[in-house]
Amino acid sequence: MSVAKSKESFPRSAHALLADLPEETLRRLEIYANLLEKWQRAINLAGKSSLDDVWVRHFADSLQVSQAVPDARRWLDLGSGAGFPGLVTAIKYADEPGALVHLVEANRRKCAFLQNVIRETSAPAIIHCGRLEKILPALDGKIEAVSARALAPLEALLRYAEKFVDQGAVGVFSKGKLFEAELTDSLTAGKYLITIIASQTCSAARLVLVRRRGG
């Protein structure tokens, strides 16, 4: 998973989502990519084939999440894993005053990895190491958007995010090709307004945006 090409035209040419990033953001993402490669040797952070294409499969894919709610700077990322999309969001907004991303992850080794990336990139993020069921009830403060990727079915995600969406946050959930099966009548006809956005990195994937009706 070499990032040497970034010294020439890569990663800007890898995907449109990367094209307009400031040099400092690209530098931080390159640090992130190198740490992924280093830590992957000891712990399973993500599938090896996906890390071979980390700039598109993970970084660009994560960038479209924050792009979907462009005014949000205070995020909550559920089940952060190796940091997609939450840590990428934090790196994107690293130089913006007031930006903060809460990363919730139960695996302590992954939490250690996330902390290492935060330290090396100065990303504005806080790690909450523990299960969602224990962390979320005690989490206070302004949250403008809630993200999750490859974590749980939509109904379960909404149970986790309900408190924050009811307070005005927007849920942004990355879903695969079977996402339509998760759009039950109870969700689409309930108190939430659901918007589907086509993924810019995978033709079969979608972003599911969830807002409180009237919010």
Where are these regions (language model features)?
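A short glycine-rich, Lys/Arg-flanked "PGG" loop and its adjoining helix->strand segment in the class I
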Residues: L158-V170
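Conserved SAM/SAH cofactor-binding pocket of Class I
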Residues: L63-A148, L158
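Active-site capping/gating segments
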Residues: I127, G176-G215
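Conserved beta-strand signature within the Rossmann-like core of class I S-adenosyl-L-methionine
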Residues: G168-L178
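Conserved beta-strand segments of alpha/beta enzyme cores
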Residues: L100, P124-I126, V170, Y192-T195
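Residue-level signal for inorganic ion chemistry
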Residues: L36, T89, K175
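Short beta->alpha hinge that forms the Motif I/post-I loop of the SAM-binding pocket
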Residues: E105-R109, P153, G176
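Class I SAM-dependent transferase core
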Residues: M1-L76, R109-A123
